[in-house]
Regions:
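Glycine-rich phosphate/pyrophosphate-handling loop used in enzymes and phosphotransfer proteins
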Residues: 1-199, 203-236
Length: 236
């Protein structure tokens, strides 16, 4: 009865689809999934025919990030951008399930049974404005798919920052400095364990760098990151 009243529809364009949380063929084809070869740190596609072993992109080679490995599922453009903006600002929590499955597929080679999954935290003021932390939703789903631990309170954002949308890479790094800290009450959970930090979008990497540097205080075995979408470098 409910199925006839509310048939499944595409998450992006509302066209009829076969199952819940799905995309129609045109929208699916417009999602820019990232495939290998890609940067070992930030997941940016690398334009190279033959690469041997993990390789950084030019930006990560010149300025290595504060983590050891990273994966990204999508490029932040076309339908992927619309989907993420709907999740972030449009209360479209129904989009998290498929998005997390794509992220899990991209980062599952980084996961081990003892990996601790956490998410980039929101400052409480921004949390009140958005009502939820989209990175935390993704982290919960990824940890559930992998059947590993999720630590929602591992990191905390103790200083609000000005919006980063129009800031340069240098401005982003300056604004994010000392904004994220390891929660002392949860630090022991991180000791000698691999940690995976989840975020929805990576542009310059300043936010994830701040989160990774905060994790260092807990002496983890390894720090990795997983990003739902990577901003193309000509967009910042």
């Amino acid at each position: 009865m409910l199925r006839s009243l509310y048939p499944p529809c595409c998450l992006l364009c509302a066209a009829p689809v076969d199952r819940d949380f799905g995309l129609c063929p045109p929208c699916w084809r417009d999602i820019p999934f990232i495939s290998q070869p890609a940067c070992m740190f930030c997941g940016m596609p690398i334009a190279a025919d033959k690469l041997e072993g993990p390789t950084p992109c030019d930006s990560c080679f010149r300025a290595p990030p504060a983590w050891e490995a990273g994966r990204a599922a999508l490029l932040y453009q076309r339908s992927a951008k619309g989907l993420i903006l709907a999740m972030k600002h449009g209360d479209r929590t129904d989009c998290f399930k498929p998005a997390a499955s794509w992220l899990f597929a991209a980062c599952q080679d980084l996961l081990t049974p003892d990996t601790i999954v956490t998410a980039v935290p929101l400052h409480w003021r921004r949390y009140l404005n958005r009502k939820y932390n989209q990175a935390a939703f993704l982290g919960q789903h990824v940890a559930r798919l992998a059947n590993i631990s999720y630590e929602p309170f591992l990191l905390k954002c103790h200083r609000a920052t000005a919006p980063l949308d129009t800031a340069s890479s240098a401005e982003r790094r300056a604004r994010m400095q000392n904004t994220i800290a390891l929660n002392p009450a949860r630090a022991q959970a991180l000791y000698n364990k691999p940690v995976l930090i989840i975020d929805d979008v990576m542009t310059s990497g300043a936010t994830l760098n701040a989160a990774a540097q905060a994790c260092r205080a807990g002496q983890p075995q390894k720090i990795s990151v997983a990003i739902l979408a990577r901003t193309p470098k000509n967009d910042y």
